[in-house]
From Swiss-Prot:
This is 1-(5-phosphoribosyl)-5-[(5-phosphoribosylamino)methylideneamino] imidazole-4-carboxamide isomerase. The active site is at D8, D129. Residues 243-262 are annotated as: Disordered. It catalyses: 1-(5-phospho-beta-D-ribosyl)-5-[(5-phospho-beta-D-ribosylamino)methylideneamino]imidazole-4-carboxamide = 5-[(5-phospho-1-deoxy-D-ribulos-1-ylimino)methylamino]-1-(5-phospho-beta-D-ribosyl)imidazole-4-carboxamide. It is found in: Cytoplasm. The keyword Transmembrane helix does not apply. Signal peptide: none annotated. Disulfide bonds: none annotated.
Length: 262
């Protein structure tokens, strides 16, 4: 399972919000580029960058900082927040962003989603942000009437292959991920799922690892890293240990003996 550190941007700073609320902000750094470099230096293999101002206003507000991050690291960067037209998508992807994450626009503008999926394929990811089983839009400030499972089915029909699933009530709380809902979402379709929201300890990562067979192949960690309840080194060590264990199990499988020749 891939561990992905989060870098959330607001007013050019690196921040974390509690349950996505704009009025409950903690500033962790005034230099998001340095933060991104630190995560890379500590071994991260991908970064998750969110333009919170963009999510709230409906258009990118921190794109300069985003592109500075992309230029400053040598690992893939996925970006979301306020990306609601083809020009936004094209600009980011042509300037080195690896994946673009669509939120509100994926629900409200399906023709736009169709167009960018047709043009860019798996570089388009949809952020499925939920509260009580319903999809949230407009920077999580509104909860749509759309139930999450039919929405996932619609995404599959439109060619989407990967989603970032966030339980809004858990995000930034350090209360642990909503494992039951993540499992329900992952089991419902063949979509690859990046889990996000609530991770606070290594036990949470171990529990998410058990959902890998359902398609949960990555996890975004935000506040836990900034608050120090998990270090990136610990998370990556767990990731490596799981890989090593899988390798050992593979080598210990009994050999198949050749059958009789006909």
């Amino acid at each position: 399972m891939l561990i992905i550190p989060a870098v959330d941007l607001r007013g050019g700073r690196c921040v974390r919000l509690f349950q996505g609320r704009a009025d409950q902000e903690t500033v962790y750094s005034t230099d998001p580029v340095a933060v991104a470099r630190t995560w890379e230096e500590q071994g991260a293999r991908r970064l998750h960058v969110v333009d919170l101002d963009g999510a709230f206003t409906g258009k990118p507000q921190n794109s300069g900082v985003v592109l500075d991050i992309v230029k400053s690291v040598n690992i893939p960067v996925q970006v979301g927040g306020g990306i609601r037209n083809p020009e936004n998508v094209k600009c980011y992807l042509e300037h080195g962003v690896d994946r673009v994450i669509l939120g509100t626009a994926a629900l409200t503008n399906p023709e736009f989603l169709d167009a960018v999926v047709a043009a860019y394929g798996e570089r388009i990811v949809v952020g499925v942000d939920c509260r009580d089983g319903r999809v949230c839009v407009q920077g999580w400030e509104q909860t749509a009437a759309t139930d999450v499972l039919p929405f996932l089915e619609e995404l599959v029909r439109r060619g989407v292959r990967r989603v970032v699933f966030t339980d809004v009530k858990r995000d930034g709380t350090l209360e642990g991920p909503n494992l039951e809902e993540i499992a329900r979402v992952a089991a419902h379709t063949e979509l690859k799922v990046i889990a996000s929201g609530g991770v606070s300890r290594l036990e949470d990562l171990r529990a998410l690892k058990k959902l890998e067979h359902l398609g949960v192949d990555s996890v975004i960690i935000g506040k836990a890293l900034y608050a120090g309840t998990i270090t990136l080194a610990e998370a990556l060590a767990l990731e490596r240990k799981e890989k090593d264990n899988v390798g050992q199990e593979d080598h210990s499988l009994p050999r198949c003996e050749p059958g009789p020749r006909g």
